[in-house]
Curated annotation (Swiss-Prot):
<comment type="function">
    <text>Catalyzes the deamination of dCTP to dUTP.</text>
</comment>
<protein>
    <recommendedName>
        <fullName>dCTP deaminase</fullName>
        <ecNumber>3.5.4.13</ecNumber>
    </recommendedName>
</protein>
<dbReference type="InterPro" id="IPR036157">
    <property type="entry name" value="dUTPase-like_sf"/>
</dbReference>
<comment type="pathway">
    <text>Pyrimidine metabolism; dUMP biosynthesis; dUMP from dCTP (dUTP route): step 1/2.</text>
</comment>
<dbReference type="InterPro" id="IPR033704">
    <property type="entry name" value="dUTPase_trimeric"/>
</dbReference>
<dbReference type="Pfam" id="PF22769">
    <property type="entry name" value="DCD"/>
</dbReference>
<dbReference type="GO" id="GO:0008829">
    <property type="term" value="F:dCTP deaminase activity"/>
</dbReference>
<feature type="binding site">
    <location>
        <position position="157"/>
    </location>
    <ligand>
        <name>dCTP</name>
    </ligand>
</feature>
<dbReference type="GO" id="GO:0000166">
    <property type="term" value="F:nucleotide binding"/>
</dbReference>
<comment type="subunit">
    <text>Homotrimer.</text>
</comment>
<comment type="similarity">
    <text>Belongs to the dCTP deaminase family.</text>
</comment>
<feature type="binding site">
    <location>
        <position position="181"/>
    </location>
    <ligand>
        <name>dCTP</name>
    </ligand>
</feature>
<keyword id="KW-0378">Hydrolase</keyword>
<dbReference type="GO" id="GO:0015949">
    <property type="term" value="P:nucleobase-containing small molecule interconversion"/>
</dbReference>
<feature type="binding site">
    <location>
        <begin position="112"/>
        <end position="117"/>
    </location>
    <ligand>
        <name>dCTP</name>
    </ligand>
</feature>
<feature type="active site" description="Proton donor/acceptor">
    <location>
        <position position="138"/>
    </location>
</feature>
<keyword id="KW-0546">Nucleotide metabolism</keyword>
Amino acid sequence: MSIKSDKWIRRMAQESGMIEPFEPGQVRQSADGQKIVSYGTSSYGYDIRCAREFKVFTNIYSTVVDPKNFDEKSFVDIESDVCIIPPNSFALARTMEYFRIPRNVLTICLGKSTYARCGIIVNVTPFEPEWEGYVTLEFSNTTPLPAKIYAGEGCAQVLFFESDEVCETSYRDRGGKYQGQTGVTLPKT
């Protein structure tokens, strides 16, 4: 299994629709010249962007967080260019990009250091072979202060690994529960 380069990522995105919309280069400034958290193709990965759709964790109803019986009232829905995450809390978001992962590819998604250096941790599970959809992102604010996330800017990097042999059973074959997700998706069992 080997990590894939910028040339491979560009080819797969442009010929197979692996990433849509796709940015073939690295964007570091907004259209009006403002500095932003970079996104797009890097040497050995792709920096994904956060969309304007957020679910911010709240303790208004004092419910228990149970992954087997998750209460949607635990979140407040926000649509904005920025999301403020309360101290020691977290938020869910989704990528602007839609992914179609090939059958012989597995990805690993890592947070960007720009956010990590501010105490904001991004967690995303691997994108399995033949998974497709918008990625649900998990942001944890580990600080005692409110933290800001920017929509339309880079938030994490996806690394692509191509296997020497095709898997016997893909995510699609298993009927994976998060297949084809279109928005921020809460836990399913």
